[in-house]
Amino acid sequence: MNIYDQLQAVEDRYEELGELLSDPDVVSDTKRFMELSREEANTRETVTAYREYKQVIQNISDAEEMIKDASGDAELEEMAKEELKESKAAKEEYEERLKILLLPKDPNDDKNIILEIRGAAGGDEAALFAGDLLTMYQKYAETQGWRFEVMESSVNGVGGIKEVVAMVSGQSVYSKLKYESGAHRVQRVPVTESQGRVHTSTATVLVMPEVEEVEYEIDQKDLRVDIYHASGAGGQNVNKVATAVRMVHIPTGIKVEMQEERTQQKNRDKAMKIIRARVADHFAQIAQDEQDAERKSTVGTGDRSERIRTYNFPQNRVTDHRIGLTLQKLDTILSGKMDEVIDALVMYDQTQKLEALNK
């Protein structure tokens, strides 16, 4: 099937989806309605671009016809030639764009995410850097108009982040932040370093798509839920009523503790949201590992222990090791202006996929 047949098939399916989504039987089936709505949303941009492309093709035909019929009218002929030139340039741009739009879509791209950041090797300095990463993502979320909610956090004695779990909600969050999973390395002189030596520390980032209950159902028999009193600083109990929740997925051993909220139900709901995402992600990673060669051919789906980026403070440098990108803009990037890095990762990923399709 050539590209034009593929595009026509996408448009035909889009029109079919419009009819299905107005079918009362589909509307009453929540899971199916959500799946079809997501499919329609995922194909809308491609269909819009294809329809615009077809109009450009028509414009080329009209301009060529106008040149033939100019009959010595120099002004009309010149206008038609200019129209033809612009339309041919637009045709080339649309063809490149449509190739990218036809690439297989990541079904999670439009989803919200659960973001986890942990201080790793480097003690207090790693925890402080984890805090810097948290601030970077919070500020980036602001620039995108996303909602950023810290669901659970644990700090150390110097104000660094031992672990933080956040929900980031908005348009196409996963499509932009999915490349952030991995080990982030920092090189800088710690505040406590009297000799001025540069230390190296790491923090790890995990990005998981939010998973709705209708998408992934966890058998309640597989969960152990413990209720206990929330603890404050110094370990004292801060609630007379037990509101904190510890939830364990028995088959995988995945555990979530939640005590940020004032009520047991709210803590339970948040814990369930996180554990559903972690369990779904756990099995998704197993499936990806079984397709190891394919997984390694793309950026953003590699080994999560892999060092993906270095932040060098003395040189104001950020290097993304996966794509060989180096920017002397560390202060800018940590202030939340991440577009240059993220756009480069998206472009690299698309290029790799296009090359794989053309082989």
UniProtKB/Swiss-Prot annotation:
Keywords: Cytoplasm, Methylation, Protein biosynthesis. One of its GO terms (cellular component) is cytoplasm. InterPro entries: PCRF, Pep_chain_release_fac_I, Pep_chain_release_fac_I_sf, Prokaryotic/Mito_RF, RF-1. Its main location: cytoplasm. The modification N5-methylglutamine is found at residue 236. SMART domains: PCRF (SM00937). Methylated by PrmC. Methylation increases the termination efficiency of RF1. It is found in: Cytoplasm. SUPFAM superfamilies: Release factor. GO terms for molecular function: translation release factor activity, codon specific. PANTHER family: LD18447P (PTHR43804:SF7). Belongs to the prokaryotic/mitochondrial release factor family. Peptide chain release factor 1 directs the termination of translation in response to the peptide chain termination codons UAG and UAA. HAMAP family: Rel_fac_1. This is Peptide chain release factor 1. It comes from Streptococcus agalactiae serotype III (strain NEM316).
